[in-house]
Every structure is written in structure tokens, then in C-alpha cells.
Amino acid sequence: GGQSLNTCPCMDDMKDTQHTFAVDFETYYDKSCSIKTLGTLGYFSHPEFDAYRVSVVGDEGTSFVGHPKDFDWPKLEGHIILSHNASFDETLFIYGVKKGWWPGFTWAEWHCTADLAAYCGLPRSLKGSTAEVFNLEISKETRNTMMGKRWESMSEEFQKGVDAYALKDSELCLR
């Protein structure tokens, strides 16, 4: 077959390149609406539950933080996904697709970096593994302060802090 004048042959190769993306959801929680007391599906189906933020960072330059319905999920089609505690993020993603909260896509693989850290003999928590591997201390104070707070009731300053926190978690997960 002939070569199209409108495309560079190198662009065909780029279409087939597999990338890796870190995905991290931020969700509402309080004492009664909690994964610890309700389990995963009980938590997701609780009337107070809200997945109000997702951060997605890719090795090809993607850096997104915002409401999950605003992310271009099909962009991740066929790629590798990482989450630090994938049993939460992957299950929430699938649950959200089934509920019509956001569109689905088919990923190549979805790996848990928390499980990987534990397998390698590192602390399972992102905070612990980041400290040990990268000699980097990260604060989980923002996450602790998010308890019982709805996105719409947070101050603009606190929302910016939540977004920065979420983005940092995905950046470290990808790292």
C-alpha cells in the first residue's frame, strides 16, 4: 500500500505506543460513610458517598485533576494503569461505569503499587514507601482534614490543596 501524504510514518508507531497512567480517586468519607465500616461496595453505594476528584498522571505528559466525569477516560484505552491501592480505585472506576457516572474503557493492565511495594519488602502505604525509596516525606494531613467535608463546602484555598495533594499522590505512584 501507498503512504498517505497527510501522515508521517512515525505517527503510526506512536498510535501503538503503550503508556502508563497513575489514577487516584478522592472521595467523601465520614464516620458512618466509610470503607472501613461498610466495605468497598457498601461505601460506594452509601447515599452520602461522592467521588469528587480524580487525578491522572501519565508518562506521556498527562497531568489532570478534576471531577471524574470531566476526565477523558477513553484516552486510557489499551494502556497500563497504576493505583496505590488498586482494589479501591479500580473497583470504584468499574462501579462508576456501571452506575453511568463516567464512560468505561478497556485497559491493558491495572496494577497496584501498594501491593508491589509490599511484595518488595517496603511499607505498603504511599507515605511509607515514598519515604523509604525516594527519601521523601509526604504529608497526609490534607487527607485527614478532608474527613466529613464535601467538595462544594470546601473553601477555594482548601480545594486547591486537595487538588495539589491528589496530583502529588498520582505523580508519586507513577514514579
Question: Predicted segments — roles?
Answer:
Residues 31-34, 65:
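Cytochrome P450 core scaffold surrounding the K-helix E-X-X-R motif
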